[in-house]
Amino acid sequence: MPSADRSVSPSLLGAAAATLRRYGPRQFSLTAVAEAAGVSRGTVHNSLGSRDNAIKIALDHLASGFVESMATELDRHDRLTDQVAAAAVLICAHRQQSDSVAARGINESILVLLLRNVGDDLMRRSIDLWKPHVGAAQQRGEVGAGIAPARASEWIVRLLMSFELLPPMGVNLDSPRAVKRFVADHIVVGLTGGQR
């Protein structure tokens, strides 16, 4: 098993993540990672350790990538409404990209794979990402002063995950403009602390 302070090469990490995406945890193998990376199975085992450890490393890599891409998108916007709308568009685009699955691959998106296998960790990371954004929105007066940033962040994350998990109904999830409008029309009203 690799030591905790030893880093895994980016190409091997990418191959492990791609293998997990393609086959899912049940069919994941170190041999498949080795084939994807163009290295020996021994090299994979020396770098990633056991099959279970390799799966954990690949899941962590995918979760980190998801949270980092959301953070990048949030940093492009100043208002909470725009940040949530941009994150919703990102998740909808991710959903569209996940629709194309290899013939022998698993029939689920990366986000569903992460929620099923490391959902608690992914939710915690995502909520932690949103807390300072909600706090900043509170300081700007976009949301009510009595709103708890942690609870509001959890609400935002749960809302965002629904764009991946629920089928499109009234809003066209394939249209970034429609998704932005849908989120912008409704997101902040619930966080002002006012009653309707």
Q: What is the role of each PLM region?
A:
Residues 57, 71-100, 153-156:
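Hydrophobic alpha-helical connector segments
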